[in-house]
Structure formats: C-alpha cells, structure tokens
C-alpha cells in the first residue's frame, strides 16, 4: 500500500499550487484525497459506472471533488484544468488508443498546465504476476513514455520509482515510471 500512496503523494507535490485538477482513471479513488487536499477543485473521471457511484458515496465528505463517467479516449470534460494526472491507466489501453488518450488529455489542459502519466515499466514486466501481465497490455519503457509525451509537450521530465522511492535514477532499472509534461506544443 505504501508504494501506491507514494505515487499519489508525488502527484500531489508536483501539482501543488494548481487550483483545478483532473484525475484520469480514478478507479476506487484510493489516493485521490491526498491530491484533493491542495486543490480548489478536482474532477475524477473513470469509465466504470460502479466505481464512480461507489466513490460518490464513499468520498462524499470531500467537498472539492466531483466524479464523472467519462472515457478520455472518446470525450473530454467541459472545462480545462491547471493539472492532470493519470496513474496506472495507460498500460490498460490498447496501444492504438495512445493518441486519443494524449490528445484528449491535452484538450482539457491549460496552456501552462502540467500533465503526469504514471505506468509500470516494461522492463519490470518479467517480474510481474500472471494477472498483471494479462491486464497490462500497453506497458511503456522510460524511452517510449518520454517519446509519447514529447509529441504533445515542450518539456518532459522523467522520474523513476522503486518501491516507494521516486527518483531520477537509471530508467531501465525502475519498477514504475512517471512522465511529467509541461508546456503544450502548439
């Protein structure tokens, strides 16, 4: 659990000072409160109605958070955001959806916004469980995540993660990767 919460803590720190934030693929909203505490407004979206309904009930005391059923590959929210984060989502999408995922994410990001994409590293896949291997159909490497995000952002900062430690060390040895996109390309 600690390593999962560390991912959200990283996003919370990077997005600190951003007022309006979008979480793409909120799932069960596990780490969402950590990011929401520094935001004026946080919209959490997911494709699963059951998760959205469960989050609306379970996390209703967090007043600055709204949940909506939106598939970012097909539609965008009706507002723009200072920051976007997506943890453990892109690896579950068919690779042909990378373009629509990134393009639609960028459509709802302000020009000076920050976009964080987190995913397990393909180089760690040989140590993954069978279940993980079956579900993770679109893993990225340090290079392929940077290359993807560089198509949409002027600056891409790459971070690696091992256990709960986020660092800038050698990407191929990381279990998990973060790409932080800054400055939308025109």
What residues fall within each predicted segment?
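Short, glycine-/aromatic-enriched active-site segment of Class I SAM-dependent methyltransferases
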Residues: 117-137
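Activation segment
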Residues: 76, 93-94, 126, 149
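Conserved N-terminal segment of class I S-adenosyl-L-methionine
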Residues: 1-85, 96-103, 108, 136-144, ...
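Short glycine-dipeptide loop
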Residues: 109-114
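Short catalytic micro-motifs in class I SAM-dependent methyltransferases
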Residues: 88-92
């Amino acid at each position: 659990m600690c390593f999962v919460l560390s991912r959200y803590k990283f996003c919370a720190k990077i997005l600190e000072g951003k007022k309006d934030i979008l979480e793409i693929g909120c799932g069960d909203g596990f780490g969402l409160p950590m990011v929401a505490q520094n935001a004026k407004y946080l919209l959490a979206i997911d494709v699963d109605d059951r998760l959205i309904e469960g989050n609306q009930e379970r996390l209703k005391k967090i007043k600055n958070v709204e949940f909506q059923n939106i598939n970012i590959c097909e539609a965008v929210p009706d507002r723009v955001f200072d920051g976007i984060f997506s943890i453990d989502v892109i690896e579950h999408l068919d690779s042909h959806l990378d373009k629509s995922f990134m393009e639609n994410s960028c459509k709802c990001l302000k020009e000076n916004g920050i976009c964080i994409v987190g995913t397990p590293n393909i180089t760690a896949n040989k140590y993954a469980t069978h279940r993980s291997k079956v579900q993770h159909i679109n893993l990225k490497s340090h290079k392929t995540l940077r290359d993807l995000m560089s198509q949409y952002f002027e600056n891409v900062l790459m971070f690696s993660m091992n256990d709960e430690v986020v660092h800038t060390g050698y990407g191929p040895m990381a279990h998990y990767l973060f790409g932080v996109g800054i400055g939308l390309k025109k």
